[in-house]
Regions:
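Catalytic zinc-binding patch centered on the HExxH motif and its immediate surroundings
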Residues: 1-39
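Alpha-helical, largely C-terminal catalytic domains
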Residues: 20-23, 44, 72
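Post-HExxH zinc-binding segment in Zn-dependent metallohydrolases
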Residues: 66-88
Length: 88
């Protein structure tokens, strides 16, 4: 069953964050603010630090759509590592 949350990002953009089953082995997807319904989908089977890393990674795609995948992967890992060590 999907778990939905709505957030305002980039000041005034309404984003849906949905935890749901994803097909094809993906852990997350970000559908840009250029779509009618900007949203982030996160695989609902993720737990712990891996889940946090994917959430941060997908949020970085939403906030910085022109950033490279390499940048969002490394920044996502680094931010998640700090948050995890601080018990968030």
């Amino acid at each position: 069953m999907a778990e939905d949350h709505t957030f305002t990002l980039n000041g005034d953009e309404r984003w849906l964050v949905r935890f749901t089953t994803l097909e094809g082995g993906a852990y997350g997807y970000t559908y840009s603010q250029k779509s009618k319904r900007p949203r982030i989908l996160i695989h609902d089977g993720l737990r712990g630090r891996h889940r946090l890393t994917i959430i941060v990674h997908e949020l970085l795609h939403a906030l910085y759509p022109s950033a490279s995948v390499e940048h969002t992967e490394q920044a996502g890992k680094d931010i998640a590592k700090v948050l995890w060590c601080l018990s968030y």
